[in-house]
């Protein structure tokens, strides 16, 4: 059976212009019965104003989960979103990723017990990212390959993800050498399974925190399905001042231990317990 109540968890931090473009994309979804959950890692009043503006438009069912700004605590706000939701199925993305119109419908259609879905994304250049208007997003033209190239996006094989023929999408999903890993821009699974592995590991910071969750889901017994050519989002460009070598090294060590020990429980997750469960 398909999920009964779908939530789309959208992380954000002080990027109101990008968030507005993303929410404009979710207003155009072909499947409308979902809740957009803004997982906000401490943004200011401008972001709250964007959320309020879209809530007042009455198209989206919006929830705003906010925490005080105390540095990069993305995993913590994601865990709060998971713990507080009534949705039985969650799609995860970021506040800089504009969804194609069938993204929610595709995740809903392909959802299956014991699986997570690994969707695709296309990174836009900064000039193209800045140029997109809410009107263009609403029209859906931004997902046309030739239109993007004319706007200034470089030609690339990655634009094949915009193919609309299902048989081509399925063929490329099977042929791609990319692993069906958990991708924080476009992945989904059942809420009960996220709770079973204790959510995201709050010891993780920027750099691989999404992959680490997927690796623990695999250890838990989950399988993953590649849908990177079936549904995509356009990733708006931005700086990454929070990426530091020492953090990457720490995160790599955590992931190495997860793989070595085949652990699935995040000791510093939704439940704050250091005793690993088996």
Label each residue range with its predicted role.
Residues 24-33:
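Short, acidic, metal-binding catalytic loop of nucleotide-sugar glycosyltransferases
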């Amino acid at each position: 059976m398909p999920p009964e109540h779908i939530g789309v968890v959208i992380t954000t931090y002080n990027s109101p212009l990008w968030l507005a473009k993303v929410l404009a994309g979710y207003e155009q979804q072909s499947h409308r019965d979902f809740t957009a959950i803004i997982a906000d890692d401490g943004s200011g009043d401008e972001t709250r104003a964007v959320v309020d503006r879209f809530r007042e438009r009455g198209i989206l069912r919006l929830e705003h989960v906010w925490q005080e700004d105390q540095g990069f605590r993305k995993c913590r706000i994601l865990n709060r979103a998971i713990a507080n939701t009534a949705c039985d199925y969650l799609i995860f993305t970021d506040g800089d990723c504009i969804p194609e119109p069938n993204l929610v419908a595709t995740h809903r259609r392909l959802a299956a017990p014991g699986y997570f879905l690994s969707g695709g994304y296309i990174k836009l250049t900064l000039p193209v990212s800045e140029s997109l208007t809410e009107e263009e997003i609403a029209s859906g033209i931004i997902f046309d390959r030739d239109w993007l190239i004319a706007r200034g996006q470089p030609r690339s094989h990655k634009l094949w993800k915009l193919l609309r023929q299902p048989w081509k999408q399925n063929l490329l999903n099977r042929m791609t050498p990319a692993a069906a890993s958990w991708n924080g821009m476009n992945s989904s699974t059942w809420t009960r399974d996220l709770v079973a592995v204790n959510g995201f590991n709050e010891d993780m910071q920027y750099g691989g925190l999404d992959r680490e969750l997927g690796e623990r889901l695999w250890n838990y017994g989950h399988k993953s399905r590649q849908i990177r050519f079936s549904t995509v989002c356009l990733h708006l460009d931005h700086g990454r001042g929070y990426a530091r070598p020492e953090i990457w090294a720490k995160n790599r060590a955590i992931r190495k231990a997860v793989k070595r020990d085949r652990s699935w429980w995040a000791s510093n997750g939704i439940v704050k317990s250091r005793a690993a469960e088996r």
